[in-house]
């Protein structure tokens, strides 16, 4: 638990209605963990009274209205205070860093249900200081940064009698992005009502404009539409939202603090999205028994009497608010040396981090940590903490740390020298004492090393500190993958409405909202042309907009089963059992199952793609077996069925499960051409049959389908050809000569889960 410094703030006073007095802080700050604040170098004056005013060095004065105490609010929802959260120190520290520097790069919190992810995000908003905005700004424009104002604000800004721009103090915005948000609501669109009234195109700001200089919260970002998430991060990376659509050309700043949360059990987040967020932390770290009891106790007390909990952490909350204000001023003067940058780069290299974002974000985090501590230079502790918060979750690490029994602990830092005896003289003036303390702090900072004695990662990329292993493993488990499989199917007739688009033919589903927005600016002109005034709204064909719909893409599992030979009946029974198990669990995932046995001279579709269990039972009641082994035709038939299903628009992922021993004796030509058997052409050799099958396997990979080969060949006569098929198709291979339906189902579900996460 950290404490704020007891040093007095110079040139800082608290003024009541009659008197002013200097103040000190000695309050526990559980939110800040082990950080300390030294506000004595502060270069601006903070005066707190009935209404607080902050006098900045440039002479601007912002009037801050006092916030209402929670106990005085008689309506509305009260959110759990951040200071009352038990544990989760790393996440709370990261949130405070984001409060100090909104452009730090964002914070992602991963965790299962009930780990206080949303609670902490909303708790941070309660301690954010208010902001000063230009009156009439739709994007919370900062009066001190006219270069970042939205288009047209300079012309419509209001000025007071003293010639200064009128400003107002508002609460820091907190905007949550719903999962079903459309592109229009996110980035902004045409204001239909105002456009109809004025006869010109009027821009209506979206959620991104509302969130500028505040908090932008995305719950379950892993479930957010892929196009929306890409658009969101692109705008946040650029820091400006540029809208070019429907006759609109508008731009406004967008620099909020991004806080994203998600549950990995409901789906992984794409790796490139996590890479663009600075701090990625897990809320699933284990809690001690006492901490869990304390968490239940404080939550129960909050439900019974929230005012009591607010009063209990009132001092800590006030200290955190002051900490944020002071650290924002310190951050302007914090510097980081070249040697310290080299240390961060080396840690990123040893951790196997891709790109340069890891060290860039880590340097910014280290400076924020130094600002919290009241330092003008980044120290050793700040570097270590930055590596833990930024680089460690991005690393590719060795699962087992090296043996540390023979490792010696790092030497302690040298003790401060040349202690000045003037500290014991209590009769000296306060200004001289502060000057001497500043001088002594500068000497200590010069004596302390600039970089840590040890790296967190060793030269091979393994963790040196085994205490961080669990934390790193949690970060690795939640990473997503990039692949070619489609998770969403777009169409114009079925699914969820995500955005309007210009029609490419007849309009199947009219986007009424977008159509009215496109027609709104021309209503006055069209009404003037209509002499009879027969309509209230004039819409022409060029205004028409179609809906772009999206729906969840299901998967198709095609079982290609070798129904030839003495073990054919067992293989067919196991494939039938595995198919029924998958269908029983595919209701929510929209997965389909198909069974194609191959025997005799050709393969046949015994069960076409279906989600119906009753249909599968009826179709699989009779299981044909015996005869030759046309493996090539079985795989070719599976590809044809998969491509037809993909064209239907219901399937986004296709996986072929081949249950075979890899021994084929029927060529593809014989299977497709009945007259080939009657001809005098020589039978193909065993090598020619293998080459033909490998060629089909290569085509499976080129079509984007996934192949899982379950080898049932006896190991004593095994040729290993089934494994070669999987290698050429770049699929998965399992050797299961006596596989049951449960084993086949488990292997299929494992491969299917990996395909869905890709």
Curated annotation (Swiss-Prot):
Q: Kindly tell me the pathway this chain contributes to.
A: Porphyrin-containing compound metabolism; chlorophyll biosynthesis
Record region (Disordered): 395-453, 669-688
The source organism is Nicotiana tabacum
Q: Which keywords does this Swiss-Prot/TrEMBL entry list?
A: ATP-binding, Chlorophyll biosynthesis, Chloroplast, Ligase, Nucleotide-binding, Photosynthesis, Plastid, Transit peptide
The terms under GO molecular function for this entry are: ATP binding; ATP hydrolysis activity; magnesium chelatase activity
Catalytic reaction list = protoporphyrin IX + Mg(2+) + ATP + H2O = Mg-protoporphyrin IX + ADP + phosphate + 3 H(+)
The coding gene here is CHLD
Subunit comment? The magnesium chelatase complex is a heterotrimer consisting of subunits CHLI, CHLD and CHLH.
Q: Enumerate the InterPro entries for this protein.
A: AAA+_ATPase, BchD/ChlD_VWA, ChlI/MoxR_AAA_lid, Mg_chelatase_ATPase-dsu, Mg_chelatse_chII-like_cat_dom, P-loop_NTPase, VWF_A, vWFA_dom_sf
Protein name, entry field: Magnesium-chelatase subunit ChlD, chloroplastic
Q: Which residues form the VWFA domain?
A: 556-752
Presence of the UniProt keyword ATP-binding in the record: yes
Compartments annotated for it: namely: Plastid, Chloroplast
The UniProt entry, under SMART domains, shows:
AAA, VWA
């Amino acid at each position: 638990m950290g404490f704020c410094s007891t040093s007095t703030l110079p040139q800082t006073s608290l003024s009541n209605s009659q008197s002013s007095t200097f103040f000190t802080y000695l309050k526990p700050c559980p939110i800040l963990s082990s950080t300390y604040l030294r506000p004595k170098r502060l270069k601006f004056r903070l005066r707190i009274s009935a209404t607080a005013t902050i006098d900045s060095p440039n002479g601007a004065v912002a009037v801050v209205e006092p916030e209402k105490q929670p106990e005085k609010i008689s309506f509305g929802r009260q959110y759990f205070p951040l200071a009352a959260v038990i544990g989760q120190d790393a996440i709370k520290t990261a949130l405070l860093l984001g409060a100090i520097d909104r452009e730090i790069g964002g914070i992602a919190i991963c965790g299962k249900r009930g780990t206080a992810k949303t609670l902490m995000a909303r708790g941070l908003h309660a301690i954010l200081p208010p902001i000063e905005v230009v009156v009439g700004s739709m994007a919370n424009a900062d009066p001190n940064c006219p270069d970042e104002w939205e288009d047209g604000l300079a012309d419509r800004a209001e000025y007071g009698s003293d010639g200064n721009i009128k400003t107002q103090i508002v609460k820091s915005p907190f905007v949550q992005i719903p999962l079903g948000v459309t592109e229009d609501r996110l980035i902004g669109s045409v204001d239909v009502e105002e456009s109809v009234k004025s006869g010109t195109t009027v821009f209506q700001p979206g959620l991104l404009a509302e969130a500028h200089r505040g908090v932008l919260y995305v719950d379950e970002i892993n479930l957010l539409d892929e196009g929306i998430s890409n658009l969101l991060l692109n705008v946040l990376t650029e820091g400006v939202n540029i809208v070019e659509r429907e006759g609109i050309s508008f731009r406004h700043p967008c620099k909020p603090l991004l806080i994203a949360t998600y549950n990995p059990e409901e789906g992984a987040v794409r790796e490139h999205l996590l890479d663009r967020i600075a701090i990625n932390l897990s809320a699933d770290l284990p809690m001690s028994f006492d901490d869990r009891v304390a968490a239940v106790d404080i939550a129960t007390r909050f439900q019974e009497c929230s005012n009591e909990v607010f009063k209990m952490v009132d001092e800590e909350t006030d200290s955190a608010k002051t900490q944020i204000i002071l650290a924002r001023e310190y951050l302007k003067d914090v510097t980081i040396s070249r040697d310290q940058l080299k240390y961060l780069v080396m840690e990123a290299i040893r951790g196997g981090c891709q790109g340069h974002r890891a060290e860039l974000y880590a340097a910014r985090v280290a400076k924020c940590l130094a600002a919290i501590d009241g330092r003008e230079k980044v120290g050793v502790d700040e570097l270590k903490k930055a590596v833990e918060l930024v680089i460690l979750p991005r690393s590719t690490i060795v699962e087992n740390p090296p043996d540390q029994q023979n490792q010696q602990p790092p030497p302690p830092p040298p003790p401060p020298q040349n202690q000045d005896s003037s500290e014991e003289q209590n009769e000296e003036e306060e200004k001289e004492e502060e000057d001497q303390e500043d001088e002594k702090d500068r000497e200590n900072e010069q004596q302390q090393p600039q970089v840590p004695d040890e790296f967190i990662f060793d030269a091979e990329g393994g963790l040196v500190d085994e205490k961080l292993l669990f934390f790193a493993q949690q970060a690795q488990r939640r990473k997503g993958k990039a692949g070619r499989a489609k998770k969403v199917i777009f169409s114009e007739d079925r699914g969820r409405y995500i955005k309007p688009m210009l029609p490419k033919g007849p309009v199947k589903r009219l986007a009424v909202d977008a159509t009215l927005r496109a027609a709104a600016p021309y209503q006055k002109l069209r009404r003037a042309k209509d002499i009879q005034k027969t309509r209230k709204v004039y819409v022409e064909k060029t205004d028409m907009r179609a809906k772009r719909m999206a729906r969840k893409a299901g998967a198709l599992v095609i079982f290609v089963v070798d129904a030839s030979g003495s073990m054919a009946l067992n293989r067919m029974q196991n494939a039938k059992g595995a198919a029924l198990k998958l269908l029983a669990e595919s209701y929510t995932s929209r997965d389909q199952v198909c069974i194609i046995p191959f025997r005799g001279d050709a393969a046949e579709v015994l069960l076409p793609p279906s989600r119906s269990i009753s249909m599968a039972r009826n179709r699989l009641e009779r299981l044909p077996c015996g005869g030759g082994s046309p493996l090539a035709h079985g795989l070719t038939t599976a590809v044809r069925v998969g491509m037809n299903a993909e064209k239907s628009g219901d399937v986004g992922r296709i996986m072929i499960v081949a249950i075979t021993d890899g021994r084929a004796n029927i060529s593809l030509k014989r299977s497709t051409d009945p007259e080939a058997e009657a001809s005098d052409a020589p039978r193909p050799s065993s090598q020619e049959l293998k080459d033909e099958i490998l060629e089909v396997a290569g085509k499976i990979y080129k079509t984007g389908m996934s192949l899982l080969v379950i080898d049932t060949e006896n190991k004593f006569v095994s040729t290993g050809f089934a494994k070669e098929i999987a290698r050429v198709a770049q699929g998965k291979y399992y050797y299961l000569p006596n596989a049951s339906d449960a084993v086949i189902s488990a292997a299929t579900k494992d491969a299917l889960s990996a395909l869905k996460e890709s």
